[in-house]
Amino acid sequence: EFRRVLFRSTLNVKKMAVKLAKIYGEDEERAALAALLHDSAKEISKDEMREILRAYPQYAEGGEERPAPVWHGVCAAILARTQWGVTDEAVLSAIACHTAGKPGMTRLDKILYLADMTSAERDWPGVEKLRKLEKKNLDAAMLAALKQTNDFVLSQGKPLDPMSKAAYEDI
């Protein structure tokens, strides 16, 4: 059941990413590829993700020092680069930062981050407002999305990823 839900979610993220790419003049194929691969490490165990982060420290972006919920994005980017032949740095960046963001996010980074937060199956208070905003102003939507994510993480009593905080301050 988890795989079916994950697959459906991935297709919804792809659809939203392509829609946003059209709006903002980003390459639709790059957006689609990033979306299709963004959660490809989601089913990997924490121990396996830790091994991947340790094996490729040059791509680990802070690795295991960061909160575990962001590891799957970084690991997905590492696997895309090392196992699946993806060489497009923009696609790899978007995959790696789709959970927490980072300072200096590109348009593609923002598109994937927002597509993941607002894809069709998402149903959280404020998602409709963010869906409208992301079609009008990418940076304003990104700021609202990062605030939503950061507030949610803090409300759960969990540590805030330093990259997420830096991304928010950067926009």
Locations of regions flagged by a protein language model:
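Short, small-residue-biased leader/transition segments that mark boundaries at the very start
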Residues: 1-6
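Residues that cap or flank secondary-structure elements
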Residues: 8-9, 68
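Divalent metal-dependent catalytic cores for phosphoryl transfer on phosphate-bearing substrates
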Residues: 18-144
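C-terminal beta-signal and terminal closure region of outer-membrane beta-barrel proteins
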Residues: 145-149
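Charged phosphate-binding loop/patch that engages nucleotide di/tri-phosphates or the phosphate backbone
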Residues: 151-171
